[in-house]
Amino acid sequence: MSQQNILAASVSALSLDESTVHTGGASSKKSRRPHRAYHNFSSGTVPTLGNSPYTTPQLNQQDGFQQPQAFTPKQFGGFNNGSGSVMSTPVMVSQERFGASEASSPYGQSMLDMTAPQPTSHIVPTQRFEDQAQYLQRSFETCRDSVPPLPTTQFYCVDQGSCDPHLMSLSMYNIPESEHLRAATKLPLGLTIQPFSTLTPNDAEVPTIPLPMDGTPLRCRRCRAYANPKFQFTYDSSVICNICRVKMQVPGEHFAPMGPNGQRSDLNEKSELLHGTVDFLVPSIYNAIQEKELLPLHYVFLIDVSLLANENGSSLAMVEGVRSCIEYISDFQPNCEVAIIVYDNKLRFFNLRPDLDNAQEYIVSELDDVFLPFYNGLFVKPGNSMKIINDTLIKISGYISTDKYSHVPQVCYGSALQAAKLALDTVTGGQGGKIICSLNSLPTIGNGNLSLKRDNAHIAHVKCDNGFYKKLASDFLKSYISLDLYVTNAGFIDMATVGHPVEMTSGILKYYPHFQQETDAFTLVNDMVTNVSNIVGYQALLKVRCSTGLSVEQYYCDSSDNTDHDPIIPVLTRDTTLDVLLKYDSKIKTGTDVHFQTALLYTDIDGVRKVRSINTSGAVSNNIREIFKFINQNPVMRIMIKDVIKTLGDCDFVKIRRLIDDKMVEILTQYRGLVSSNSSTQLILPDSIKTLPAYMLAFEKSELMKPNAQSTRGNERIYDLLKYDSLNSAQLCYKLYPQIVPFHVLLEETDLTFYDANDKLLQINSSSINNLSVRASHSNFINGGCYLIFQGDTIYLWFNENTNRMLLQDLLSVDESLPVSQISLFSGTLPETGTSINQKASNVIKNWQQVVNKSSLPLVLLRPNVDQYYSNVMSQLLCEDKTVNRIESYDNYLVIMHKKIQEKLQKDDFIKVSTAATHENIHQKFVQF
């Protein structure tokens, strides 16, 4: 049989067969495993276990929970159902109102019954459209729905006492009762936490709980969990903690009498007992530095004005970015203070005191032992000193543009960072702040200078091995300082070393190779303003608490060294995302609920100390079929990728790819052997993780994982590595598998238009999904087509010389006679032409901006035989194609996996489930915040 026939036979039968549950034979041997909720790729095999009966648990009812009022998104056309309630489901702007009989309460179904996710396609773009379609006419209700929508799906959420999954989500919503059962899935048990994710609608605010009379929130005296909707209050003035199940007396200041319905009489006044996510105001005992008064966030802007930065225009772009950021801070963060320092082979400080007539510059040439030439006027509130700030920026621009004979090629990057830290420590008393820095070339002078070298592949690993930058990063962390770095040159700068403080302090690194002022300046300025606008707080400490039986194995965070130590996050943004791996301490009782609480202690940008409490739960199960059914793919994928990244070692990427493939085969073999054993001739993908192979294959083809025989620490590889620490879930999904939307196909009138009045839900008719679902493969591109392609931070517009010129005229407002090679975009944005196709394209771009939480996204032309970067970009975008280093195409990858799965099944080489094996009980450790 030909390869094509094999491929067709193997791939065409993709399905999810849940009609039969396999019950394998008993194991002949049992052995103890470490209490770990997920095995590294280097771990050994897991012991084979026997059979177990299957039951389907339901979430248990918690006393003291009151249903919240029905939810209507802002501007939605909700209607009265005759009893005063309002539909919680979004109503399309143009649709007719339903009849009264259809307006029943959205809570008619018991909140205890978890709703299984609907089956979707195994093709990534199709799955995204299908998933979005499911949430056009309904909201996600946190006590009824279980597995959340895809990260790329926009949806409205009703907080019914469990958090919005944007903020925290589980990898499994039916949690295995034991480590043995979890091991049988070969999947990680963990959490993905994005504490300040943008909620829908945008004005959905997290409630703030004021300080009670005694000055402390209600907390469990044993495990220190914060009060939440699953706290059980009793008639004897006690409360039972849902985390550790300990009963304690309710303090007098938190007491309220119980009503006949078993609920507190003041329940409607207690947001912390109604909502899954709240902010507690906390007293000074919670301060990062007890004896210090809290301060608003302080910014230091560091501008590289060396010769190369001035020649390519990146220094001028940085000056404009600083101006835009300070204007934003003045308008939206008025209590924050800013400082400006520029550097080349010297440090230049600027006095920004509002009572000055002109900008004052102080030059420091002592780089080995940096000092501050002045104190008063180093930091100012922008609103008070905007005149002097503008004068300072004009003076810097004049130096860059006209004083060219004074420009030098050296940069004292390390000394500049030390100066910024010294400034923050001196003014804030060690309370931290944000450093925003540009860098254009390898640091060669001052502290932290690096010898001129090239990436010669002699160093196999990708970790920082420079003592100065490792110590500097550690010092930043202790002082709650975070660094954002903007690199504006393609030359080798040892990014693994100079970017280490960024990685350690949860900062952001942006890379603009071959920087050109005409095309990249706009993007740089927008990136800077977006990153500043995303900042929500600083001085953060995070802790996850779990019900007895589970605990944290590790936080995937460099500040905690990827251990179970509570991670420090110097500066928080809306995109700050943390993945957590859990472990079993003991077996958990089937039919009960497991509760999870993330407590994030932080100071907001205005200097107010708070704790954000985020709560969710899952049901305990011993049914392997139900466990697979309620898998949440996004945390699974993120944890698998983080586990690879944190164990790169000597970067043998061939071996690492093989281990990833083996892990995928093991997962699918377990599903096939335990759940869908009857479909012997079919390739079976569990519906809950149907696209996981596509994403993991795309990860194998990423810039990070490319062959390293010639280059191990190049800028592109390290930049790709650092991205995985800073991307939120939606950005990561688009980065791994770009979304491609064709505009040359026939579209319905309502296709690619917004369904709701808030312009959040992009709709596509079911009849158009196939036409609009373009797989990331060269064979799916049509000569003469026109496509928008999005890969997380950049949108590409693909067309060629055969594209319909009338289409381009309607889309871009370009003359039909203008050659394709001469078409350009002003400031990297889509022009407004007033045509239907232009409006649809604008809607798509707006939707992507909302999903990834960006105020703007650059639009870049991508034309074959025109743009020099075309081949390189296309090789990154087309993740389903076979690569030059012989990583298989997606279809062939599935065929190869199918063969390996069949071989393992024939050998009976998979773990069989059993409830006979037990672990000794290890009580959850006492945790203190």
UniProtKB/Swiss-Prot annotation:
Biased amino acid composition, Basic residues: 29-38
CDD domains hit by this protein: Sec24-like
Phosphoserine: modified positions: 15, 83, 85, 94, 101, 110
Record lineage: Eukaryota, Fungi, Dikarya, Ascomycota, Saccharomycotina
UniProt keyword annotation of Membrane present: yes
Complex formation: COPII is composed of at least five proteins: the SEC23/24 complex, the SEC13/31 complex and SAR1. Binds to SED5. Interacts with GHR1.
Homology family: Belongs to the SEC23/SEC24 family. SEC24 subfamily.
Gene3D superfamilies referenced in this protein's UniProt entry, alphabetically: beta-sandwich domain of Sec23/24, Sec23/Sec24 helical domain, Severin, von Willebrand factor, type A domain, Zn-finger domain of Sec23/24
SUPFAM superfamilies named among the record's database cross-references: beta-sandwich domain of Sec23/24 (SSF81995), C-terminal, gelsolin-like domain of Sec23/24 (SSF82754), Helical domain of Sec23/24 (SSF81811), vWA-like (SSF53300), Zn-finger domain of Sec23/24 (SSF82919)
Signal peptide: none
Highest rank taxon of the organism: Eukaryota
Gene Ontology CC annotations of this record: cell periphery; COPII vesicle coat; endoplasmic reticulum; endoplasmic reticulum exit site; endoplasmic reticulum membrane; Golgi membrane; mating projection tip
Subcellular location: Cytoplasm; Golgi apparatus membrane; Endoplasmic reticulum membrane
PTM annotation (Phosphothreonine): residues: 72, 216
PANTHER family, per database record: SEC24-RELATED PROTEIN (PTHR13803), SECRETORY 24CD, ISOFORM C (PTHR13803:SF4)
Species per Swiss-Prot/TrEMBL record: Saccharomyces cerevisiae (strain ATCC 204508 / S288c)
Function: Component of the COPII coat, that covers ER-derived vesicles involved in transport from the endoplasmic reticulum to the Golgi apparatus. COPII acts in the cytoplasm to promote the transport of secretory, plasma membrane, and vacuolar proteins from the endoplasmic reticulum to the Golgi complex.
Protein name: SED5-binding protein 3
Keyword Protease attached: no
Region (Zinc finger-like) residue spans: 220-244
One term of GO molecular function: signal sequence binding
GO BP, one annotated term: intracellular protein transport
Residues annotated as transmembrane: none
Coiled-coil stretches noted in the UniProt entry, renumbered to this chain: none
Main subcellular location: cytoplasm
Biased composition range(s): Polar residues: 18-28, 40-52
Region (Disordered): 18-52
